[in-house]
Amino acid sequence: DKRGEVSVVLKTDGTLENLTASVNAALSDRASMDCREAAAGTADSFYGTGGFLQVVRDDGYSRPFVGACALCDNETGNAEEFFAANFEEYFTVSEQLPTRFAFYLGGGCDYFLAALQALPGCGKNWEVSAKDKLAAVLNEYRCGKSAAESATSVFGEISCEEERDLRYRCNCSAEYLKGVLSTLGKDELESILQEQGAVKIHCRYCNKDYAFTRTDLADLLSRLGK
């Protein structure tokens, strides 16, 4: 089904205030980040000392699953270790599915993620094995191999079933945002139009600005008035 979407929200009390990312079933993704200035006289801690990670899985049928966990590792300055530790915490706490991650953030479009999940009967030492396997896969990738080649090199008994490209694409549009505005109700929209002359929206994902005049919203206001 191409209507599903997964969203991740990360909030900390450090310089990184909010990080939001989402990807749909067509592998179109978008993301935004908000940062705050460090208080005067304090050490600049990017991840702070507290916060939470939230994951929303929407199957497209208005049945979203929302899970969350407190951040467990804010001390490391290494982004790869930070994300790996906290996603592992999320899967353990919220979904009760032990998972190990390996991240590579090379800058720009050069990034890599590998994950291994425990299955019934995997044994008590699976974590050690998973850690070693992930380190080996990551090393292969850093040596110039593709993601599929890296996995096949370490897990020789498996093969890549499918390769798909991820692309950055915002799904905002005038029609989509009118649907969002409908949740404000007619009275609120009328008040904004009266005070400002237009309802203005800034998309934080693609930085596009929208301005809806009374003429633009005539049909919506008519429907809301019924």
Regions found by a protein language model. Give the residues of each.
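Cys/His-clustered metal-coordination modules, chiefly Zn-binding fingers
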Residues: 131-226
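Interaction interfaces in information-processing and related assembly proteins
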Residues: 1-160
